[in-house]
Amino acid sequence: AEREVYRVPEEWIGYGTWVANSDCTKLVGIEIARRDWTPLNDWKIFHDFFHKGPHCRLLRVDLKTGESTTIHEEKIWLGHPIYRPFDDNTVAFCHEGPHDLVDARMWLVNEDGSNVRKVKAHAEGESCTHEFWVPDGSALVYVSYLKGQQGRTISRFNPDTGVNEAVMNMPACSHLMSNVDGTMLVGDGSGTPVDVKDTGGYTIDNDPYLYAFDVAKKAYFRIARHDTSWATVANSRQVTHPHPSFTPDEKAVLYSSDKDGKPALYIAKLPEQPEMLHA
């Protein structure tokens, strides 16, 4: 039977993805004040919304009682809240907006709202994007790229030591995800990023492939072509983005594409004898 656990209050708008903890007993999410809200139907509006400095709050919701508690609140566009797996006290979130304009994208906060801390200070011309927790909770992995460069870097942050490190170079993938322990990653080849202000400075060639990355070997291989258009469809900016992830047995990859005309889900099996490449 279905039941309503929580309803966003009238004066707020629920934004982005809301993510459960490992036990699926609670969620973290972002709400934006309705008075500041603009429907983000395309990337031009996305850029303009950043400069508005909307009133946002990061909250948690108890999935049993529906009780909500504000963890963090400020007049900065917040997004991408994610519990650290198996550690409910640690929540990651981001400062949303064009990656070359945000002060620092990735942040952590304790679940009680204390100890707000920056994951990484951006280097000159550096953009960081699509951070995610390795499913075992061991690291926060993200994509880093520099203005004027075609390639990108897979990096990771250890929340226990506070150390950032570059893992390996890679082709220009937009979204990464890992297997359970972070030894294998999967990414989607992309083109010039739309979520930066200076698109001219970040122009790159389009890449239509899905890639798997072997972290120990610092090498990668092509899985299949995704051939998505990256287009905004029906006012949804990310419905055509591949966002690949491994199947539970790690033998195939699930992804989205509109290569056949409409956005759809596909599964591509990993090759049995892949050709290993180096960036």
Regions found by a protein language model. Give the residues of each.
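Loop/turn-rich, solvent-exposed surfaces of beta-rich toroidal or solenoidal domains
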Residues: 149-152, 167-222
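Conserved blade-ending motifs and adjacent loop-strand segments that build the rim/top face
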Residues: 123, 167-177, 218-245
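Blade-terminus and WD-like Trp-Asp/Gly-His loop motifs, strongest in beta-propeller folds
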Residues: 17-27, 81-91, 131-141, 176-185, ...
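Asp-box/WD-like beta-propeller blade repeats and closely related beta-sheet repeat scaffolds
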Residues: 1-57, 66, 70-73
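Short loop/turn segments that connect beta-strands within beta-propeller blades
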Residues: 1, 62-66, 110-114, 158-162, ...
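Short coil/turn segments at the loop-to-beta-strand junctions that recur within blades
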Residues: 8-14, 74-79, 122-128, 169-175, ...
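Short, conserved, GDST-rich strand-edge loop motifs in beta-rich repeat architectures
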Residues: 29-53, 94-103, 145-147, 187-206
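Blade-level signature of beta-propeller repeat domains, shared across WD40, Kelch, NHL, RCC1
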Residues: 240-279
